[in-house]
Design a protein with these regions (language model features):
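Glycine-centered recognition micro-motifs in short, flexible terminal segments and loops
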Residues: 1-21
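N-terminal helix-rich module
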Residues: 1-8, 26, 30-64, 68-149
């Protein structure tokens, strides 16, 4: 009769909770910087895609309207300006201020697309931090390519 019933041990001890929280904190500490780098790479890739798309669109418009289109790159103001043969500004595209733009040659800062699909050609290097891309416009075909360096 003097026997006491056993109590089922349910729940976690304080030590188990502390160890679990420590493991979670270490995991978050390792994963968070990788997520930050990943989002920066995605942002730069999106900017480069927009940069390339401006050239592609200007080429398509030159072919469909049968008039030359020119894309002028202003690396200082991070701005692309698209004009027609009469120097009429058709549209502009602002780029991120953190994106550095370099032309391989100074004359490449202006790329002219002809109605036949050809262009004056050009090559650009776009960088943000350690992430870099090379965008080239072929002179013969007018094709625009972007490659990560």
């Amino acid at each position: 009769m003097g026997q006491q019933p056993e109590v089922d041990a349910r729940g976690f001890t304080l030590l188990e909770l502390i160890v679990t929280l420590l493991v979670v904190a270490i995991a978050v500490g390792l994963v968070a910087p990788a997520i930050g780098r990943s989002t920066e790479a995605l942002r730069v890739r999106a900017e480069v895609a927009g940069f390339s798309a401006t050239f592609r669109h200007a080429r398509e418009r030159a072919i469909t309207t049968r008039q030359p289109f020119t894309v002028a790159v202003n690396p200082t103001n991070h701005l692309l300006t698209v004009t027609t043969g009469e120097d009429e500004v058709r549209w502009t595209r602002a780029l991120s201020g953190s994106l550095a733009i370099e032309a391989r040659t100074p004359s490449a800062l202006t790329v002219r697309f002809e109605p036949q699909g050809t262009s004056s050609g050009g090559e650009f290097r776009l960088t943000s931090g350690k992430i870099g891309y090379r965008v080239s416009v072929d002179a013969v075909t007018g094709r625009v390519r972007s490659l990560r360096e």
